Amino acid sequence: MERNPGATPLLVRKGVRRGCVANELSRPGRRAVMMGLGAAAALIPGAHAAGGLARLTLWPDLPPGGGGPSGPQVEDGSGAVSNVSTPVLEVFLPQKPSGAAVLVAGGGGYRRIGLVKEAYPAAYLLASQGITAFVLTYRLPSENWADGPVVAMQDGQRALRVIRANAERFGLDPGRIGVMGFSAGGHLCGMVAARSTFRAYTPVDAVDELSARPDFAALIYPVVSLQPPFDTTNTRRSLVGETPPPEARAAWSLHTHVGPDCPSIFLVQADDDRVVNPQQSRILDEACRGAKVMVEYHRFAVGGHGFGIGSAEASVALWPRLYRLWLTSLSVMR
């Protein structure tokens, strides 16, 4: 029997709306909120401690792509997940919705997805600012999918369509729906933004008649290029293998797809990033400017890789405030 993405039951947790984690909260404060979520979740069948207020299944039946992992989804000690066979969206509702929404994708080299360290904190921060956040658990290309690297894009495109299909339900403006990705999640969100006309899968229902183009995109220390000398990342290994031909490297390099239809981009990276060469963000910045795509690029001297929404001890903690100002300049926040 087909499941309508708009018919997923809403899981409401006591205190969650009041417990949105803002960037200014201390570490003990964040921990207390997460513990409170755990206690509330225990009262609700099917709920889990770290997630959102609703869960939306992306696909009405088995996802496209063929194959996939066996066994249950796995979560490691850091809160990153892998062995994903059922991609989902978790919804974080603001107390005072602005009508804007953001799809959030954590990183992990397309080998796992950083939910607890990247995606969930970003989602709570967005919700605290009136933005409905949708955290995407996407399929990982390295987990035996016949469609290989395309499966993550299938989930990214479908996620944006499912969000638009649920716009009325969650009080959203279909013209103010963006994406935010970290590291490999930044690569995914960037590819979805730059290749919105690419059909990653055959339509399965009426939801696929909706647009998969985000209206704005935030890419935080993203993987951009899979070409030498920037081909040392797990993202490259997961997407195109150990010895890919040049055309495969180019096809999955984000900057090669930037064109006039690409939405405005907000770009953040630290100059001391030892995982993703900071030159990658500069390449993307240049590609956007060359294609006359509006781009705002913020370089921080110190921050490394994987700083998420930042900590009070480092200047990278400023980027969420800059992001909000950027959204205001785009009239996303009104």
Residue spans for each PLM region:
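Mobile cap/lid helix-loop segments that gate and shape the active-site cleft of serine hydrolases
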Residues: 73-78, 206, 222-257, 263
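Primarily recognizes the serine-hydrolase "nucleophile elbow" in alpha/beta-hydrolase
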Residues: 158-231, 249
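Short beta-strand/loop motif that positions the catalytic acidic residue
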Residues: 267-269
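Short beta-strand element of the alpha/beta-hydrolase
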Residues: 99-107
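Catalytic nucleophile-loop/oxyanion-hole region of alpha/beta-hydrolase
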Residues: 114-122, 136-174, 311-316
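C-terminal catalytic histidine-bearing segment of alpha/beta-hydrolase fold enzymes
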Residues: 278, 282-334
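N-terminal secretory signal peptides
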Residues: 1-28, 39-41
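Acidic catalytic loop of the alpha/beta-hydrolase fold
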Residues: 272-276
